[in-house]
Curated annotation (Swiss-Prot):
PANTHER family: 50S RIBOSOMAL PROTEIN L4, LARGE RIBOSOMAL SUBUNIT PROTEIN UL4M. It comes from Polynucleobacter necessarius subsp. necessarius (strain STIR1). One of the primary rRNA binding proteins, this protein initially binds near the 5'-end of the 23S rRNA. It is important during the early stages of 50S assembly. It makes multiple contacts with different domains of the 23S rRNA in the assembled 50S subunit and ribosome. InterPro entries: Ribosomal_uL4, Ribosomal_uL4-like, Ribosomal_uL4_dom_sf. This is Large ribosomal subunit protein uL4. Residues 43-78 are annotated as: Disordered. HAMAP family: Ribosomal_uL4_B (MF_01328_B). The gene is rplD. Signal peptide: none annotated.
Amino acid sequence: MELKLLQDNGILGAGVQASPEVFEREYNEALVHQVVVAYQANARSGNRAQKDREQVKHTTKKPWRQKGTGRARAGMSSSPLWRGGGRIFPNSPEENFSQKVNKKMYRAGMRSILSQLAREGRLNVIDQFNLDAPKTKVLAEKMKAMGLDSVLIIVDQVSENLYLASRNLHKVAVVEPQHADPLALVQYKKVLVSKAAITKIEELLK
């Protein structure tokens, strides 16, 4: 499998050989969907909470007598039927949203995503990606020169300059191969991978 090399001026150069086992697999849409949804679900923190009828502030006094008023019987104002009453099935921070995806499925999903990106021309290789200074302006100008807007950059080792320069750019993310996730791969318009990172990705996903 040959991946195009993207130069600093935005022109595609000679191809770089990559393993077909990782970058030339059939696209499995159902598997990719499952892996991405599971990744999002496992990232949920469970930060919503509602009160049931035991937790709302209320009096236990009976609102009116049981019989003789013509009104529906009522026991206390915390009833879920009443305004200000508790919820019947309240949301809780202890809810578990996690979804199980085994390693074999996860790796297959990642291979499927990378292969599809390569077919669509959204995945390119770069020689190396270093900055002389931790300046966001320098990185933004480099992205503009390469014709990139929304991009995920995967490098063998993230330098301090590159990390500091990229963290204030909304549509630019820089990660190492072991931290590349399925959501980021499908979320960004373009994926740039350094030559050294290609080797690491192949080792991780074989």
